[in-house]
Structures are given as C-alpha cells and as structure tokens.
C-alpha cells in the first residue's frame, strides 16, 4: 500500500472511532504503522480507556500466571472491546496469544485442564454469563502470524493492547 493510501485509511479509521466515542491516538498510529504516519494524520489525542476496560486489563494482569506455561508463551494481548477501550461491565476479556512453534495444541490442552478447576475461561456454551471471563480469541504459533485481510482482523490488530512481552508487538 502506498503512503497516501495508508494515511487515508488511518484518517477514515480515526473518524469512525471518534463517532463511536473512542478516538485513535498518535501513539497507536506510531506503534502500528510507524512514526512517519502519526505526523501525517490530523489527530485528536484522546485515546483513554474507560474505567471498565482498565479494570479488566488489571484483572488479566493479576491472572497472567494462569496463561504462562513452561516459558513457551511469547505474547499475550487484549483485543476486542477491552483493547479498543470501550468495554462494558458485562463484557468478557478477549485474548490474543502467541506461543512457540509446535506448542499450540499442548498449550490449548493446558488451558482446558486449568479451566476445569478455575472456570475463568469462556466456553462456547457460556452465552449469558461472560462477565470478566477470558475469551481466547486466537492462539497462534510464531510461524503462523499471518492473517486474512478483512475488517475483523484489522480491528483486532488495530486495538490490540500488549499485556505480556510488549516488545513482541513488532512481530505481529
């Protein structure tokens, strides 16, 4: 994509987010697309998380040990409404997890087993009571961090907030 197209898309996204009350900050643009683009877009520097999102991020940070097995986890981030900063009290906490190659299914098994005792991970059957449960939206191996070019993936990656190993964001 050419620079002009990227700047145009960033500006469209900024306008969309401002209409829903969640502005896009120049630091987000710089982190995702690079510092050269944050200078080229007219920004409203108001990318604050609402109180519910802050509480849910704090809850994940306190529970992080439940998701770190055998030093194989490379990255954990929050996506969805919490990552975007407009979470509601009844929302779950969407997770984006990257693990070492050849460890994804073993990791998933450990998550399932640990959930038998804690019940903190949202299951498909959990339709009504999802408040503060962790929804593992994506578990990827390092070699598999390639996404379809669609609006869902764009939104998930755009508002991804690192919680564990922030330096890994440059690989995503």
Model-identified regions with their sequence ranges:
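Catalytic core of pol beta-like nucleotidyltransferases
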Residues: 2-90, 99-172
């Amino acid at each position: 994509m050419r620079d002009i197209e990227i700047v145009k898309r960033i500006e469209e996204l900024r306008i969309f987010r401002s209409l829903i009350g969640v502005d896009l900050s120049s630091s987000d643009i710089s982190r995702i697309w690079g510092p050269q683009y944050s200078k080229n877009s007219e920004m409203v520097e108001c990318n604050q998380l609402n109180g519910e999102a802050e509480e849910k991020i704090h809850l994940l940070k306190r529970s992080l040990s439940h998701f770190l097995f055998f030093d194989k986890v490379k990255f954990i981030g929050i996506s969805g409404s919490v990552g975007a900063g407009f979470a509601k009290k009844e929302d779950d906490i969407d997770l984006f997890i990257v693990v070492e190659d050849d460890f994804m299914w073993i990791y998933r098994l450990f998550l399932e087993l640990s959930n038998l005792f804690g019940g903190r991970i949202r299951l498909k059957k959990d339709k009504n009571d999802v408040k503060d449960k962790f929804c593992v939206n994506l578990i990827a191996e390092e070699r598999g961090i390639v996404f379809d070019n669609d609006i869902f993936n764009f939104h998930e990656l755009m508002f991804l907030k690192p919680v564990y190993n922030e330096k890994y964001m440059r690989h995503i």
